[in-house]
Amino acid sequence: MPKTVLVVDDSKSVRAVIGTTLQVAGYNVIQASDGQEGLDILSGNKHIELIITDLNMPNMDGLTFIQEVKKLPDYKSTPICMLTTETEQSKLVEGNSVSTDAWITKPVQPAHVINIVTEILPP
């Protein structure tokens, strides 16, 4: 059975690139346009095995989303990848603002997404 990845990003084009890339590689993909929608999906689904989330989104940003995910008993230990620009990533790392399992920098490169995801969650 394919493993399921939740992709949370307000950019429809970024979700499309990541979603298509992962589907071609054999993953199930569920998409959300912001952190609140992502939480709503998680509350109704117990089978998501990896979360990829953007940092900057309306309604609920990526940092708040991650904090809320870590409060959910079923998802406390679920791996999370953060989508950022290189500038955002370096600021977050310097400030110890977030703990993630991996970083995916924008602009999104499909080969990089596959490398990161298959390392964390082999198909």
Role assignments for model-derived ranges:
Residues 54, 84:
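Active-site residues of response regulator receiver
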Residues 31-50:
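Acidic, metal-coordinating helix/loop segments flanking the phosphotransfer/catalytic sites
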Residues 108-117:
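C-terminal output helix
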Residues 16-24:
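Charged docking surfaces used in two-component/phosphorelay signaling
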